[in-house]
């Protein structure tokens, strides 16, 4: 016969991890890109995905991606193509922001960080200007 373990009143139930507010992170990242909508085209897709591309078919008859935000299971990704297309831009990425990079052009965030988002906004402005120089915009 199996005996049940006695439960102690000192035992506490396991606490669930608080859910990350990825919707808030997504919205904050989207605010960085919204000023560029008037110069670019928003690709309609899904609520958890936001993408800006050039209006002109500038590369092999297709629009060029500028940036995209994707809400994932563990973080929100900010894909930023000017950094990929112009590797020299990577030299100007602050070390704190570079820690969030995955691959050549993706930054992952699990929470809103105003200081990092300001750095990302400056990088986005520089990337937009690089697209103007390349005549993508």
Region spans (language model):
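Charge-dense, helix-prone N-terminal extensions
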Residues: 1-137
């Amino acid at each position: 016969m199996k005996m049940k373990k006695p439960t102690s009143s000192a035992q506490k139930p396991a606490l669930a991890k608080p859910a990350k507010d990825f919707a808030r992170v997504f919205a904050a990242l989207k605010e960085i890109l919204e000023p560029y909508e008037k110069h670019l085209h928003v690709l309609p897709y899904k609520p958890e995905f936001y993408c800006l591309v050039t209006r002109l078919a500038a590369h092999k008859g297709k629009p060029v991606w500028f940036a995209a935000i994707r809400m994932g299971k563990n973080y929100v990704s900010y894909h930023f193509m000017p950094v990929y297309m112009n590797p020299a831009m990577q030299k100007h990425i602050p070390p704190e922001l570079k820690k969030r990079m995955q691959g050549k052009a993706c930054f992952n965030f699990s929470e809103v960080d105003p200081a990092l988002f300001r750095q990302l906004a400056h990088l986005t402005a520089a990337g937009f200007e690089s697209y103007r120089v390349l005549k993508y915009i």
